[in-house]
Curated annotation (Swiss-Prot):
GO molecular function ontology, one term from the record: translation elongation factor activity
NCBIfam families linked: tsf
Protein name: Elongation factor Ts
GO cellular component: cytoplasm
Role description: Associates with the EF-Tu.GDP complex and induces the exchange of GDP to GTP. It remains bound to the aminoacyl-tRNA.EF-Tu.GTP complex up to the GTP hydrolysis stage on the ribosome.
Chain residue ranges for the region called Involved in Mg(2+) ion dislocation from EF-Tu: 80-83
Keywords assigned by UniProt, alphabetized: Cytoplasm, Elongation factor, Protein biosynthesis
Domain of life, source organism: Bacteria
Subcellular location: Cytoplasm
Family statement drawn from the similarity comment of this UniProt entry: Belongs to the EF-Ts family.
Length: 293
């Protein structure tokens, strides 16, 4: 049996808002596996949803550049938010985005070898900036997105580039595409529509809702109907086109765009530092180590 630590209990409580004993019991039942512990709590009806782990170390900026029917969305990391607000850093990020949109590199290695308008490669520019600023600067990721002449790009940067959202809308106009990009930045949908949800994930969620409903003591014959309703509600919450439009919750994103004569074709959303785990320092252990030393 895995040893359950106070830090694990705290993380689970932070992510699910359950009590300490419920969190500890779930971790014990899941043998220390955080995701399984969340499922245990959800099946018992103790946690309706779980926040994603918020441990983020990297600072930096996300940016979007458009070059005709090609757009590039990028993330460049620095070590502190102070550097992220530096004008030289901002200029570099803009130059990188423009170079990637113009050259459409196939992967990160090719992107770092891409030449910018000043003649330096993306990697050379990062090294030069690192020397000047004194912090490691690096291109973390990018995506190149293409559209047709009948489609529109929508781009939106939140908080100066902490979040970047790029959309592709068929028909409609640039303003509609930007409105949807703003929605994507704010609501953070997981998929374009229900058909994009992986079958494995759909089954996993259906199983959880089934156990949750049974544990509520619902009559067996109505369990499938209740589960179907909960699955549909969940799908509507994670699918962009089915979400309530952030600027007009009385209609879905799909209906808003359709009213403008368009259809949502795709989106990309970057949030600076997402998915990067921050090292958690245990200062009590650090003090004990110093005492023992």
């Amino acid at each position: 049996m895995a040893q359950i630590t106070a830090a694990q209990v705290k993380e689970l409580r932070d992510r699910t808002q359950v009590g300490m004993m419920d969190a500890k019991k779930a971790l014990v039942a899941a043998d220390g596996d955080m995701d399984k512990a969340i499922d245990v709590l959800r099946e018992k009806g103790l946690a309706k949803a779980a926040k994603k782990s918020g441990n983020i170390a990297a600072e930096g900026l996300a940016e979007i550049a458009v070059n005709g029917n090609t757009a590039a969305i990028i993330e460049v990391n620095s070590e502190t938010d102070f550097v992220a607000s530096n004008d030289q850093f901002k200029d570099y990020v803009n130059n990188v985005a423009a170079a990637i949109a113009a050259n459409k590199p196939a992967d990160l290695e090719a992107a770092k070898a891409t030449k910018m308008s000043d003649g330096q490669t993306v990697d050379e520019g990062a090294i030069a900036l690192t020397t000047v600023i004194g912090e490691k600067i690096s291109l973390r990721r990018f995506q190149v997105v293409e559209k047709t002449d009948n489609e529109h790009f929508g781009k939106y940067l939140h908080n100066g580039g902490q979040i970047a959202a790029l959309t592709v809308i068929e028909g409609a106009d640039d303003d509609t595409a930007k409105d949807v990009a703003m929605h994507v930045a704010a609501i953070n949908p997981e998929y374009l529509d229900r058909t994009k949800v992986p079958a494995e994930e759909l089954k996993h969620q259906t199983d959880i809702f089934t156990e949750e409903t049974k544990n509520e003591g619902k009559p067996e014959k109505i369990v499938p109907r209740i589960v179907e309703g909960r699955v549909n509600k969940w799908l509507g919450e994670i699918s962009l086109v089915d979400q309530e439009f952030v600027k007009d919750p009385d209609q879905t994103v799909a209906k808003y765009v359709a009213a403008k004569g368009g259809k949502v074709k795709g989106f990309v959303r970057y949030e600076v530092g997402e998915g990067i785990e921050k090292k958690q320092e245990n200062f009590a252990d650090e003090v004990m180590d110093q005492i023992k030393g």
